[in-house]
């Protein structure tokens, strides 16, 4: 059950709309601000896909949706919000302007999460003159309404209490919060993806394989292993009865071989862009983006549902969380009164802690 009653979403693109969908489908009221005149239509399209996926997850009926309001200003959107998620484009100057306005108008005890995929929170906090201590990075993965991972990163001015409250908030809407121990650009997930992306660009550019062949190598091979065990546990099993030490002794030396070009970046010229875009068009076989999104969502639900039945019915990995989340949604759907009142009761029992500025040390 969520510990927030009203949320605000600043930015309604793919990620922002995904946050809106997850929050609304958990019965939480959301006020959104996005200057794009097409924002309402785009959010509506994402909501259609999210509702469809959630109906598969909870066939017995979904909770009463939260109310969605389109605000005319950031100030209007964040008024009375317990939780604010910023999802504007990845430009530091824009982040500064938006966060400064959020900070000026949001309640002092509201947690502010940023969806940035690479900017350090310390670099964003400088724009927040009132309460920089309540800003955390809350980096999700697309589609936000289905993929549970959220990377939480604190900056130099972030209070530890803010990180703890952020963890509770994200967990309450069915997510898997992972706190990154040290502040670093691009955090963890995107750093791994960038390394694979760079090497993939070289493989396509050099004609080693096509984009479809590369994707097949991932989805028919190690991608299936990663989805349920990650990287290190897969390698532990690959080491046999001797485990990880044997694996590292056997395969560690190959890291010295010059197999990859991970530190080099191919020139992103028109020729490479055209090559990849053309092959990607061929790979789609005429399917639209919306059709591909539907296939993606159906597959994700099926994978998580399958994993939820493993480990003697307790669920495994993302499946264990999926099992608990679908139970939570079903329980919320069966509850009376409506979800917003239930969230208010939860908030009253465990309020979001109000941030306090550290006391200045006395001179002398």
Swiss-Prot record:
Catalytic activity, EC: 1.1.1.108
Subunit structure: Homodimer.
Signal peptide: none
Similarity section: Belongs to the 3-hydroxyacyl-CoA dehydrogenase family. L-carnitine dehydrogenase subfamily.
Basic residues: compositionally biased ranges: 348-364
GO CC entries: cytoplasm
UniProt protein name: L-carnitine dehydrogenase
Stated role: Catalyzes the NAD(+)-dependent oxidation of L-carnitine to 3-dehydrocarnitine.
SUPFAM superfamilies with a match to the protein in the record: 6-phosphogluconate dehydrogenase C-terminal domain-like, NAD(P)-binding Rossmann-fold domains
Residue numbers binding NAD(+): 11-16
A molecular-function term among this protein's GO annotations: NAD+ binding
Pathway: Amine and polyamine metabolism; carnitine metabolism
Subcellular location: Cytoplasm
Catalytic activity, reaction form: carnitine + NAD(+) = 3-dehydrocarnitine + NADH + H(+)
The UniProt record lists the keyword Cytoplasm: yes
Region Disordered: start-end pairs: 336-364
One GO BP: carnitine metabolic process
């Amino acid at each position: 059950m969520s510990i927030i009653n009203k949320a605000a979403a600043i930015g309604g693109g793919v990620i922002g709309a995904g946050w809106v969908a997850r929050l609304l489908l958990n019965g939480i009221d959301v006020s959104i601000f996005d200057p794009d005149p097409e924002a309402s239509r785009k959010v509506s399209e994402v909501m259609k896909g999210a509702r469809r996926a959630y109906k598969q997850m909870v066939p017995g009926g979904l909770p009463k949706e939260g109310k969605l309001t389109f605000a005319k200003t950031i100030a209007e959107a964040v008024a009375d919000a317990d939780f604010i998620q910023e999802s504007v484009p990845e430009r530091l100057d824009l982040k500064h302007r938006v966060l400064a306005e959020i900070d000026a108008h949001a309640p002092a005890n509201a947690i502010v999460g940023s969806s940035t995929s690479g900017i350090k929170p310390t670099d964003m906090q400088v724009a927040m003159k009132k309460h920089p201590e309540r800003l955390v990075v809350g980096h999700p993965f697309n589609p936000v309404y289905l993929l549970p991972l959220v990377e939480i990163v604190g900056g130099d001015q972030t209070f530890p209490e803010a990180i703890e409250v952020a963890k509770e908030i994200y967990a309450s809407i069915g997510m898997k919060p992972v706190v990154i121990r040290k502040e670093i650009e691009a955090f963890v997930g995107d750093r791994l993806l960038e390394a694979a992306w760079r090497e993939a660009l070289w493989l396509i550019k050099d004609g080693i394989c096509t984009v479809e062949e590369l994707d097949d190598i991932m989805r028919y091979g190690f991608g299936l292993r990663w989805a349920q065990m990650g990287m290190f546990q897969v390698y532990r099993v690959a080491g046999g009865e001797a485990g990880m030490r044997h694996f590292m002794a056997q395969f560690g030396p190959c890291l010295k071989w010059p197999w990859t070009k991970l530190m080099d970046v191919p020139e992103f010229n028109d020729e490479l862009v055209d090559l990849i875009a053309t092959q990607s068009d061929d790979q789609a076989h005429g399917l639209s983006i919306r059709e591909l999104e539907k296939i993606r969502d159906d597959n994700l639900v099926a994978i998580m549902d399958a994993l939820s039945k493993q480990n003697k019915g307790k669920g495994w990995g993302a499946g264990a969380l999926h099992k608990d989340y679908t139970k939570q949604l079903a329980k919320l759907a069966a509850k009376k009164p409506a979800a917003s009142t239930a969230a208010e009761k939860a908030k009253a029992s465990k309020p979001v802690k109000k941030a306090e500025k550290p006391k200045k040390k006395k001179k002398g």
